[in-house]
């Protein structure tokens, strides 16, 4: 399998080879930049150009495998913990459409549904993650993210399930791009679950308490709060590393490529590192404010505080970004490996 990450500014490609049971070696990695108008605010505007860029990347990296995995995220994705009466997986599978209709903000006929049973819970227990949603706007207070109907089941033994809905046209769009690049789609996952799986390769998330896995993308910052190894809350903030790139270009009057080098810590002799750090801090202030709001919202509803932050995504490569986040959020911050 080859893994394809289609982001706002570039396409990333990774291929792993299992050399021992459960142990993998990175055998291929490549990246192909995309024009700024190819993907806007997470939506693919020029699928033909994206497919051509993917074709060129596959050719450049000499990829032989035709089977691909990819992932989707953003406003087309809905994730929510729900409570339902205790039943078997087969029974819930037969009733999931009826259950989902009272929660999801999309036409039920236009989405692909899935679920995972998380276990029995006290019917009267309030869980903050019940009000979590994948596509909350950064301009909306997290406290407003509670507009869905409350569970209306009669009192009795209840269980918790993770409900996932994805608009079919987004899945079809991603599938078509892979096929246009002469690949065979094997899996279309959700970004949040793909990141959790990647983190789980090197860290036992179930033993880490309550952590935040934060993906610093170019157009979006994705917050994923994981509690004892299970998804607890997700949020998308429509501000990312692209905002920092624009600020650096404006400040230092450098072309795009040189600005990317600056973000990686490659300063020219004419620059003062303190000035770069100041711009980075100002650029991420808005993101950090929104992350802090999300942490407070989750803590208020779940009675759990964030114990650690794991950073990933292109923004995590910015020199010193983990220090900025740790200073502001007052929790330990690490760069995720892998």
Residue ranges, per PLM feature:
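Conserved phosphate-binding/catalytic loops in two-lobed NTP-binding clefts
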Residues: 323-338
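Gly/Thr-rich phosphate-binding beta-strand-loop-beta motif of the actin/hexokinase/Hsp70
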Residues: 1-33, 66-73, 202-233, 237-243, ...
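Phosphate/pyrophosphate-binding loops at sites that engage ATP/ADP/AMP, CoA/4′-phosphopantetheine
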Residues: 54-67, 254, 292-308
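Non-catalytic, solvent-exposed interaction/assembly segments
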Residues: 1-99, 133-136, 142, 148, ...
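Active-site neighborhood for divalent-cation/phosphate handling
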Residues: 71-201, 308, 338
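Adenine-nucleotide phosphate-binding core of ATP-dependent small-molecule kinases
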Residues: 261-308, 314-315
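Glycine-rich phosphate-binding loop plus the immediately following alpha-helix
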Residues: 39, 168-197, 230-271
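Short flexible coil/turn linkers enriched for glycine and charged/polar residues
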Residues: 7-10, 64, 74-76, 109, ...
């Amino acid at each position: 399998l080859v893994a394809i990450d289609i982001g706002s500014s570039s396409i990333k490609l990774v291929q792993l080879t299992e050399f021992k049971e459960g142990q993998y070696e990175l055998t291929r990695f490549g990246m192909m930049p995309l024009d700024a108008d190819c993907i806007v605010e997470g939506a693919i505007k020029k699928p033909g150009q994206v497919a051509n860029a993917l074709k060129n990347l596959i050719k450049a990296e000499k990829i032989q495998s035709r089977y691909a995995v990819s992932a989707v995220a953003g406003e087309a994705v809905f994730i929510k913990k729900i409570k339902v009466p205790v039943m078997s997986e087969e029974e819930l599978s037969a009733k999931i459409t009826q259950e989902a209709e009272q929660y999801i903000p999309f036409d039920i006929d236009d989405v692909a549904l899935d679920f995972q049973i998380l276990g029995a819970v006290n019917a009267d227990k309030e869980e903050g993650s019940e009000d979590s949603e994948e596509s909350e706007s950064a301009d909306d207070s997290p406290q407003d993210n509670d507009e869905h109907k409350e569970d209306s089941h009669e009192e009795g033994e209840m269980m918790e399930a993770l409900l996932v809905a994805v608009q079919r046209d987004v899945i079809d769009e991603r599938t078509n791009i892979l096929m246009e690049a002469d690949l065979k789609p094997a899996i279309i996952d959700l970004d949040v679950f793909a990141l959790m799986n990647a983190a789980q390769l090197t860290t036992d998330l179930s033993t880490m308490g309550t952590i935040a896995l934060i993906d610093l993308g170019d157009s979006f910052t994705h917050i994923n709060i994981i509690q004892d190894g299970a998804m607890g809350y997700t949020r998308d903030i429509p501000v990312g590393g692209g905002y920092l790139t624009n600020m650096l270009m404006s400040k230092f009057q450098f072309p795009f490529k040189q600005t990317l080098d600056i973000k990686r810590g490659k300063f020219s002799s004419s620059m003062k590192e303190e000035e770069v750090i100041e711009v980075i801090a100002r650029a991420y202030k808005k993101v950090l404010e929104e992350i802090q709001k999300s942490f407070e919202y989750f803590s208020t509803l779940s009675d759990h505080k964030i114990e650690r932050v794991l950073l990933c995504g292109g923004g995590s490569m910015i020199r010193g970004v983990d220090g900025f986040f740790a200073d502001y959020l007052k929790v330990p911050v690490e760069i995720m490996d892998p």
